[in-house]
Swiss-Prot record:
Lineage: Bacteria, Bacillati, Bacillota, Clostridia, Peptostreptococcales
NCBIfam families: minE (TIGR01215)
Gene label: minE
BP GO terms, sorted: cell division; regulation of division septum assembly
Source organism (scientific name): Clostridioides difficile (strain 630)
Pfam families (alphabetical): MinE (PF03776)
Function: Prevents the cell division inhibition by proteins MinC and MinD at internal division sites while permitting inhibition at polar sites. This ensures cell division at the proper site by restricting the formation of a division septum at the midpoint of the long axis of the cell.
Protein name per the record: Cell division topological specificity factor
Keyword Zinc-finger (UniProt): no
Assigned protein family: Belongs to the MinE family.
This protein's record includes keyword ATP-binding: no
Keywords: Cell cycle, Cell division
Length: 94
């Protein structure tokens, strides 16, 4: 999936912005008690399953853990957030 805003923006990834994103990722992993290795295993498994049914676009692919408020009791809960752009759905008859 082509992100037109990203293509036409003047925003270049600086080492500062990359370091900031990495630090955010480390902090989120610490808060949700999920190691980067575990998240990578989850990501790999999810992508394998989806690849059985659709062709995945690598650009824009993002899978991460985050904290959010619970729906019923407002307690913090861990959430797996995935943005997986698809090129097309495979035609499969079962």
């Amino acid at each position: 999936m082509l992100d037109l805003f990203r293509v036409f923006s003047n925003e270049a990834k600086t080492s500062k912005s990359v370091a900031k994103e990495r630090l955010k990722l480390v902090l989120v992993h610490d808060r949700v008690d999920c190691s980067p290795q575990l998240l990578e295993m989850i990501k790999t498994d999810i992508l394998k399953v989806i690849a059985n049914y659709a062709e995945i676009e690598d650009d824009g692919l993002e899978i991460k853990m985050s904290k959010c408020r619970g729906e019923h009791d407002d307690k913090p809960v861990s959430a797996l957030v995935a943005n997986i752009p698809l090129k097309n759905i495979k035609d499969r008859c079962m």
